């Protein structure tokens, strides 16, 4: 079998695993895409343009560093205290906290409040980041993990530049402030989807039976 047919088959299998075998896995994948696209647009375009227009481009580094430190601290805290709350509780708190942080950043406030928004976003993102990563590994059958993760990484690499390009068009046509508000609106939609999605209502349930998943994967391979 040639390289190209094998690659196409792996891509098709990866897509089926990510989007058709398990509700939690599907929602986790879609949320990951949404988060990468919106945050990539904020960090890669909106905030740099805002600080450059303000005449203080060097302040961007402090905002992004604050966000990263908050994410690191909350990830460590989640690892230590995760058993004290249900996964659903951590998930809901994280999504609401991230929405608050994005809303603060999207308002493009004075610098101290910008740092506050970055800190809130970073601290809130830790549990969600850990949970989404866990669901990806826990719900993907081992036999197709390489195909699924490879497909996800490929799609993410394509999604982020597309989102930044679309945001650049918005910034050019509407201005930085309006583009930031649009991104906040997109994040609100992501948060609403994350909270009401059927697959994310019982996050403490066990993963589906691996044998059933392997059967679905075998069917996907035969179809490809």
Give the label of every model feature segment.
Residues 197-224:
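Intrinsic disorder in cytosolic terminal tails and internal cytosolic loops
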Residues 67, 75, 79, 117-168:
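Substrate-agnostic recognition of the 12-TM MFS/MFS-like secondary transporter fold
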Residues 52-54, 162-181:
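Transmembrane alpha-helix termini and helix-breaking/packing motifs in multi-pass membrane transporters
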Residues 106-118:
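Helix-loop junctions at membrane interfaces in 12-TM secondary transporters
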Residues 16-75:
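A single, central transmembrane helix in multi-pass transporters
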């Amino acid at each position: 079998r040639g390289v190209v047919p094998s690659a196409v088959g792996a891509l098709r299998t990866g897509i089926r695993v990510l989007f058709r075998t398990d509700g939690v896995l599907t929602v986790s994948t879609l949320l990951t895409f949404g988060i990468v696209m919106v945050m990539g647009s904020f960090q890669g375009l909106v905030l740099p343009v805002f600080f450059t227009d303000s005449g203080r481009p060097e302040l961007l580094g402090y905002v992004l560093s604050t966000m990263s430190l908050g994410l690191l601290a909350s990830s460590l805290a989640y690892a230590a205290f995760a058993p004290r709350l249900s996964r659903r509780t951590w998930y809901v708190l994280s999504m609401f906290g991230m929405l608050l942080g994005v809303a603060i950043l999207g308002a493009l406030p004075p610098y101290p409040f910008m740092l506050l928004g970055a800190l809130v976003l970073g601290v809130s993102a830790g549990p969600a980041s850990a949970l989404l990563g866990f669901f990806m590994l826990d719900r993907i059958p081992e036999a197709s993990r390489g195909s699924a993760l490879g497909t996800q990484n490929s799609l993410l690499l394509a999604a982020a530049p597309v989102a930044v390009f679309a945001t650049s068009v918005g910034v050019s046509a509407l201005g930085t402030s309006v583009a930031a508000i649009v991104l906040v609106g997109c994040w609100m939609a992501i948060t609403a989807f994350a909270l009401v999605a059927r697959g994310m209502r019982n996050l403490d349930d066990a993963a589906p039976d691996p044998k059933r998943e392997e059967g679905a994967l075998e069917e996907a391979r035969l179809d490809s």
